[in-house]
Regions:
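Active-site rim/loop-helix segments in enzyme catalytic domains that contact anionic ligands
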Residues: 1-86, 116
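Metal-dependent de-N-acetylase/amidase catalytic core
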Residues: 68-154
Length: 154
């Protein structure tokens, strides 16, 4: 369960690649499947046999500047808890929001409050990109996400 389309590539891909015994599905707080970023990331993961679900909440960069969520956080929290309920384990953002991102903190808090066991990402994306992923991130498949993903490389 992640906040944004690029988060799973930045923070979770090495774990997903090295734990292929799990039946993965990726759940996104923001964007809809039909929006360009949602569509691109859904196609990327579909090539790897992984389904995605997008809750469609707005990814407003001003949320970070204002330190406040601009979407209906009560509705979002309910949807996160409901969509995570069938799962035995959730891989998600850590409580500090990885690097303090308000949307990441929100997702982490919702997963924690759901009571479902969780594994959290490391606090810095660089460790995640270099922890031994089996399959290299093919950035040419993610032109709309490339710039953000590259910010987390060494």
């Amino acid at each position: 369960m992640v906040a944004h389309p690029d988060d799973c590539v930045i923070f979770a891909k090495p774990f997903i690649d090295t734990h292929d015994q799990f039946d993965w599905q990726i759940l996104y707080l923001t964007y809809a499947q039909f929006e360009p970023r949602g569509k691109e990331i859904a196609e990327y993961w579909a090539k790897q046999g992984i389904l995605t679900t997008h809750l469609g909440f707005t990814d407003d960069y001003q949320d970070m500047e204002n330190n406040a969520l601009s979407f209906n956080h009560e509705q979002a929290a309910r949807e996160i808890v409901n969509i995570c309920q069938p799962y035995d384990l959730v891989l998600t953002h850590n409580p500090d929001g990885d690097y303090g991102h308000i949307h990441h903190k929100f997702v982490s808090q919702c997963v924690t409050e759901s009571g479902i066991p969780a594994i959290y990402f490391a606090s810095q994306g660089k460790e995640n990109l270099t922890c031994g992923a089996k399959n290299k991130v093919m950035l040419e498949d993610l032109p709309l996400h490339r710039e953000v993903i590259e910010q987390f490389k060494n």
